Amino acid sequence: MAESNKELVDRLSAPRGDRKPLAIALVGPTAAGKTDLAIALHQQLGAEIISVDSAMVYRDMNIGTAKPTASELALAPHRLIDIRDPAEAYSVADFCRDAKAEIESIHSQGKIPVLAGGTMMYFKALLEGLSDMPASDPAVRAQIDKRASEEGWPALHSELASVDPETAANIHPNHSHRISRALEVYVISGKRMSAWRGQANNGLIDTYDWVQICVAPRERTLLHQRIAQRFDMMLEQGFIDEVRALYSRNDLNVDMPSIRAVGYRQAWDYLAGVSSYDEMREKGIAATRQLAKRQFTWLRSWQGLEWIYTQDEDANLLSSEEIVNKALNYLAKRTI
């Protein structure tokens, strides 16, 4: 930690009157630079990083998730990375439980937690809380899966739209797991998933003094360029070999949450002979762009975000140092 930031750290960490413990939420679209800023905050402030990423929880999925490298993790450890095998499920409720425990652990050490990632549903559930919607029923799930094999997931998505249009509007017609879960909840309870979510509880928004920062480019075209460049870099780094190792295990399939992760689904189809290499690349980039679009939709409705742009008003790229200084300056204002 730089000595010049010690005073800032002391102000951020020290209790002051009725002020709640500080927690930093660092969000943004994919490929925007969240990891770099999180590592910088660790170096500058001694903050502890908690990953908020539904794909990085899986072991042996490193390149395609843009997981921090071994050297980066040695420099700035990330919690909630590599905690599940790709064959295992990891729910939103699992994340909320684990993240709450990590935040408490970090505060007990007198440090500041930085929750960094792009899985917006995780952030929303952690801050606003989870509802007590019914647990999964294997028999009901099996019935839905049987119908899907006969009718196709788009048909079941249309059915979901007829009973719960709000939930269906936020789910892609081919996102089997989410369609299945939403229909399952409706069949079991007779109540829409959107109605259950309206009864959320146990959120942390009022438990901590949240500093909520979004790092993003001013222009979407820059993000699209970075997405394409990063996907090509992943391919050069051996992404296909990484997915091939998962494919050859024979205990994973394309309907599992791990393999549905952006990029992995497209590479899986390539290895299965469903698409060509060029088609895989195009679809992988397109899927990542769609992910960024969905993330921006969440972010635009997020109240209380401090936007830190990676470009100036003339669309020129800012240096890493300039971006970090923007974040530190905003944090300093919060202590006044």
Curated annotation (Swiss-Prot):
Residues 53-56 are annotated as: Interaction with substrate tRNA. SUPFAM superfamilies: P-loop containing nucleoside triphosphate hydrolases. It is an enzyme of class 2 (transferase). Its EC number is 2.5.1.75. ATP binds at residues 28-35. GO terms for biological process: tRNA modification. Pfam families: IPPT. Gene3D superfamilies: 1.10.20.140, P-loop containing nucleotide triphosphate hydrolases. Catalyzes the transfer of a dimethylallyl group onto the adenine at position 37 in tRNAs that read codons beginning with uridine, leading to the formation of N6-(dimethylallyl)adenosine (i(6)A). Coiled coil: none annotated. InterPro entries: Dimethylallyltransferase (IPR039657), IPT (IPR018022), P-loop_NTPase (IPR027417). Signal peptide: none annotated. Its cofactor is Mg(2+). Substrate binds at residues 30-35. It comes from the Bacteria. Monomer. Keywords: ATP-binding, Magnesium, Nucleotide-binding, Transferase, tRNA processing. The gene is miaA. It catalyses: adenosine(37) in tRNA + dimethylallyl diphosphate = N(6)-dimethylallyladenosine(37) in tRNA + diphosphate. Belongs to the IPP transferase family. This is tRNA dimethylallyltransferase. The record marks 119, 141 as: Interaction with substrate tRNA.
